[in-house]
From Swiss-Prot:
Biological process terms in GO annotation: fatty acid biosynthetic process; secondary metabolite biosynthetic process
Subunit-level organization: Homodimer.
Lineage: Bacteria, Pseudomonadati, Campylobacterota, Epsilonproteobacteria, Campylobacterales
GO cellular component: cytoplasm
Native source species: Sulfurovum sp. (strain NBC37-1)
Annotated GO MF terms: 3-oxoacyl-[acyl-carrier-protein] synthase activity; beta-ketoacyl-acyl-carrier-protein synthase III activity
Location of the protein in the cell: Cytoplasm
Biological role: Catalyzes the condensation reaction of fatty acid synthesis by the addition to an acyl acceptor of two carbons from malonyl-ACP. Catalyzes the first condensation reaction which initiates fatty acid synthesis and may therefore play a role in governing the total rate of fatty acid production. Possesses both acetoacetyl-ACP synthase and acetyl transacylase activities. Its substrate specificity determines the biosynthesis of branched-chain and/or straight-chain of fatty acids.
Record protein name field: Beta-ketoacyl-[acyl-carrier-protein] synthase III
Gene (UniProt): fabH
Amino acid sequence: MSQTKPVYASFRSIGAYVPSKILSNADLEKMVDTTDEWIVKRTGIKERHIAADDEYTSDMGAKAAKLAIERAGIEKEDIDLVLCATVTPDYFNMPSTACIISDKLGIRNVQAFDISAACSGFVYLLTVAKAFIESGMKKNVLIIGAEKFSSVVDYTDRSTCILFGDGAGAAIISATDKKEEGFIDVHASADGSYADFLVTPAPGAINPASQKVIDEGLNFVQMKGNETFKLAVKTLTKDVKEILAKNKIDSGDIPHFIPHQANYRIIKAVGDALKMREDQVVLTVGKYGNTSAASIPMAINEIWESGRLKTGDLMLLDTFGGGLTWASALLPFAGESVQR
């Protein structure tokens, strides 16, 4: 009796895009009651990129995706699933941003849909892509994390406007028969009892579009900062310890720990709890801020373009976001290294 050969999901390429406009801490000093010193001390953020008025989530996602496709060495016709993680879609509920990105890339008659898992979105997509590929249903999955967070930020609220930036990252996840190229583990979870920690109240079924929404600023992101900080450190640390223990991998053996880039103090606290060396921890929050679902792929792209990420290198991804959601992944980089 013939035996079906196992199929594994592999991380084949990465791409990213950031808008050209930079909003510095000095700029924010002129807009709200804050200082560069305070922002850097509390968050580690020095600047963030902001999309133009006529530049949308789908535009940024399509540009990142185009790079990922080119770097994977495949054609757009080879893609059989398009997934987008975003909480700042082009449209409130339909069409999906994944469908719009597919159209902008010229990808036709291919399944496409969005997921909403806030900052955990990209790693959530890895779980979906893995399931589709290892079931044999798909061979090349385009995953995108893209956000125009400036569209839901109140630039008179100093507690949130200092944190967020815009951008996009994308990857090609492909089928392979080589176990050493395949994902080692991915994990995602959620707890809706903390839903009010991070929320954009409107528009939605609870707060439909109305004058009240505009007057009360319900269309802007709201955040319980202190509570979110404490829970993020606790949850991220626990999640990483569990995935490492499950797979019998020591934290010191991870060359690239890529956490969600929300806040330097969160990243440092988690890194310290895991006894990670500074050279293991990837940091991009200083120049991009929190780009939500785009954060992790943008960070991966940063170390790939610099030549730091090599073929076969192990990546540990860890993220936490509104929902509340959290996710982690252990996987090798199966793409080509940058040639220098």
